[in-house]
Structure formats: structure tokens, C-alpha cells
Regions:
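Active-site region of the double-stranded beta-helix
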Residues: 1-12, 24-186, 194-236
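Fe(II)/2-oxoglutarate
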Residues: 170-181, 197-297
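Conserved beta-strand-loop-short alpha-helix elements that form
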Residues: 189
Length: 297
């Protein structure tokens, strides 16, 4: 997707937004037909989809319906007619984590995640021409935007200078680093934390896939440290008197001190940065009931 990764990592990764034009067009892992199919299936449910108009998320009832099953009502199922009507009226359709249900996108995200050693999630955006889905905002991920159909005009600001920022809407995004139109077949890289916004171009319906490369942060470091503190430590749950409570406190402190004395920042960072690679042996028919039946014949 990035061609030779060395120049990209040296000059763009985490530094600047960049439009990539692969010499051989990428095969689209998903298409609008797939979107129509899953909408029509009746099984897609909030929060896997959201409809946004003029920068604001619509109420779920405006694009979903309620299903009655086993004497109960279940809300939040995508209503294809309502969704299509909102898109025709200028709203943006957002589909989250499609790697959960679309096999081609899951394989694509797995390959990218294996190459980068990171967790990769996939989001779809369908935006009418001349319309903006979201105002300027920051994402807690590096993003590769695969423009699959139509085009979008992007405005991307400089990435944060330090770690004191938050994901979400950004009222003061700072100076613009890149303003460009991304066309079908092109890939846009947006560095983690760089505020950005986009408007559907005049080429018709814009359809793009955002591959978000998740990065660990302070929260992950804390969680890993807490996991290690609890690992291999057996303490009484309810000490019965002050003396036992003090002994328990001493054991707890001694355990933590030993762990901290042996743990390095590099080891802690490596623990949260490591993402298991997809298991090739578990792929294909072995993940299906049909494959299971065949294996037992």
C-alpha cells in the first residue's frame, strides 16, 4: 500500500499527511454492493452503523427499526430504506469495524496489522457530493484512507507536538499541513492525532475505507503494569486482624518492589506494542462450520 516502506517510515510516519498513489491499483476489499447486502440482511445493528448530518449524529430511531423476537423487542437494527433516504438527503453513513463481519476486509486488515505489528480496524464512509460528514477532529490512530469510489476534498492539520491532546472534535486545529482531493484508487495517510475534515467531491457519491492503526498509550501501560502486579501473587482476600493485614500489605509491597526493580521501560513498552499475528492455520475453511464438517468426514 505504501510501496517501499523505508522512505515512508523515514519521512511521513507520524510526521506528515501524504497522498499515496500505488503503481498497481489496490484491489478494493469491499464495495457498495457489500454495504447494500448487509443493510438488506436485517442483521446489522447499532453501534456498527451511524448516520451523520451536518456534523451531528442522528437519533438512532431515525435510521433504525425495532425487531420482535422470542417475545421481546430489540431496537437498533439498520433500516435500509431509512438509511438510503438520509444519504440521498445529504447525510453520511458510517459503518464501524466492518472487519468483524466482512471477510475480505478482515483479511486485508490482518495483513496490514501483521506488517505493522499493530491492531488494525476498518471503517466505511459513504458521503454525498459536496457534503461534510464530521467537523475537524482528531483520531487516536494512524489512518490509511482507501478511496474506493468518487473523491473527497481533505484538509489535514499538523500532528500534535506532544502527548497533551485528546481525540475527538477540535475547535482550534492549528495550521493546515495538507489540503488535497483524494480520488478513487488513491490512498491518504493521516498521522495519529492530526486534526482533519473532508467534503465529498463533485464526482458523485464518495465511498472510502479507513484503516485505523491503533497505538498504545498511557492507559495501556497502566493496564499492563496492573496485570503484572497481580500476576503470581496470592494474598488473603479478607485478613482477619490488623497483624495479618500488615503482613499482607508487606507482601504486596515486596512483590511490587521486586517487579519494579526488574522491569525496564523498554520491556513495558514492548509488552503493549506487541500484537499477536493472525494464525495462518486458523484461516480459511477451518473457521467455518462447513470446514468443521469436512474435517470430521
Amino acid at each position: 500500500m505504501v510501496g517501499d516502506p523505508a522512505p515512508f517510515l523515514a519521512t511521513a510516519w507520524r510526521r506528515r499527511a501524504l497522498v499515496l498513489r500505488p503503481p498497481v491499483p489496490l484491489a478494493a476489499p469491499v464495495g457498495l454492493v457489500d454495504v447494500d447486502t448487509v443493510l438488506a440482511s436485517g442483521l446489522l445493528r447499532v453501534p456498527y452503523l451511524e448516520v451523520v448530518a451536518d456534523g451531528k449524529a442522528l437519533e438512532q430511531s431515525e435510521y433504525t427499526s425495532t425487531r420482535h423476537l422470542v417475545d421481546r423487542n430489540f431496537r437498533g437494527y439498520a433500516d435500509p430504506d431509512k438509511v438510503r433516504g438520509h444519504v440521498e438527503s445529504g447525510a453520511t453513513l458510517v459503518m464501524r469495524n466492518i472487519e468483524h463481519w466482512h471477510a475480505g476486509t478482515a483479511a486485508f486488515a490482518d495483513r496490514l496489522g501483521a506488517e505493522l505489528g499493530r491492531r488494525v480496524e476498518a471503517f466505511l464512509f459513504v458521503t454525498p457530493p459536496g457534503r461534510r460528514g464530521f467537523p475537524a477532529h482528531r483520531d487516536d490512530a494512524d489512518v490509511f484512507v482507501l478511496q474506493l469510489q468518487g473523491g473527497k476534498r481533505w484538509q489535514i492539520h499538523h500532528p500534535p507536538a506532544d502527548g497533551n491532546w485528546r481525540p475527538g472534535p477540535e475547535a482550534d486545529p492549528g495550521p493546515v499541513q495538507l489540503e488535497t482531493t483524494v480520488h478513487a484508487g488513491e490512498v491518504l495517510y493521516v498521522p495519529r492525532g492530526a486534526a482533519h475534515s473532508a467534503v465529498g467531491h463533485t464526482e458523485g457519491l464518495s465511498f472510502h475505507l479507513s484503516l485505523t492503526v491503533r497505538q498504545p498509550g498511557t492507559g495501556e501501560l497502566r493496564a499492563e503494569l496492573a496485570r503484572r502486579f497481580a500476576e503470581g501473587l496470592v494474598l488473603p482476600l479478607l485478613p482477619i486482624d490488623p497483624a495479618e493485614l500488615r503482613r499482607t500489605a508487606q507482601e504486596l509491597l515486596d512483590h511490587h518492589r521486586r517487579l519494579l526493580a526488574a522491569l525496564t521501560p523498554e520491556e513495558l513498552c514492548a509488552a503493549v506494542e506487541t500484537v499477536p499475528r493472525p494464525d495462518a492455520d486458523s484461516a480459511g475453511d477451518r473457521r467455518t462450520l462447513a470446514g468443521l464438517a469436512t474435517a470430521r468426514d
